[in-house]
Amino acid sequence: MSGTLRALARFRKLAVIRRPTEGGYGTSLHRDHGGEFDYNLDWKPLGGFPVTVGWINAIRRGQLQLHRGLDVGVPNLILRSDHTVAETATSVGMERGDAVLDVSQIARWAGCVGSRSTVIPVTDAKHDVFLSLPAPRAVAFGELNRWLDWYLPQAVSRTTQHEQA
């Protein structure tokens, strides 16, 4: 598939392979459609953007790099939902889970980001973890604060030692 996709992307990178859907994940976010947040729908449409061959090709290339291992060189925190849910036309089914990505794939490949990765599944979190319902969002901020409390003193200590050397 990757060879075919690469070839197609060279000649038809703007070809649309999936059009925006009615409703979708955005309805679980935007306040006019049952969500909690107000944002510019031109920047993040409810049904997403058209998916093009070039976009899928770029994603696939990035995934292949990830599968080989990246090591981003810095500690990283990966917060994700604890489960995947189906994307539906209404927001109710997407309130408590990731309706965009397969979280089992995130769990499988997160360790390839670098040697200092912390992966934390957040119960009932949405795809955009910090846009989740209040309870999982509070858990996510708590985990972020704990991670920063753990990491920042180490980073400051290393910086100070490096400057003194």
Write out the residue ranges for each language-model feature.
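Alpha/beta-hydrolase-fold enzymes
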Residues: 1-50
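Short, glycine/serine-rich, charged loops/turns that create anion-binding
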Residues: 83-85, 126
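Short amphipathic alpha-helices and their capping/turn segments at secondary-structure boundaries
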Residues: 11-12, 63-73, 108-112
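Conserved active-site and cofactor/substrate-binding residues in soluble primary-metabolism enzymes
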Residues: 50, 54, 101-104, 139
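Active-site nucleophile elbow and catalytic-triad environment of alpha/beta-hydrolase enzymes
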Residues: 47-69
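Catalytic active-site module of serine/aspartate enzymes centered on a nucleophile-bearing elbow/loop
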Residues: 113-165
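Conserved loop-alpha-helix segment in the C-terminal half of the alpha/beta-hydrolase fold
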Residues: 77, 85-121
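Short beta-strand/loop motif that positions the catalytic acidic residue
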Residues: 72, 78-80
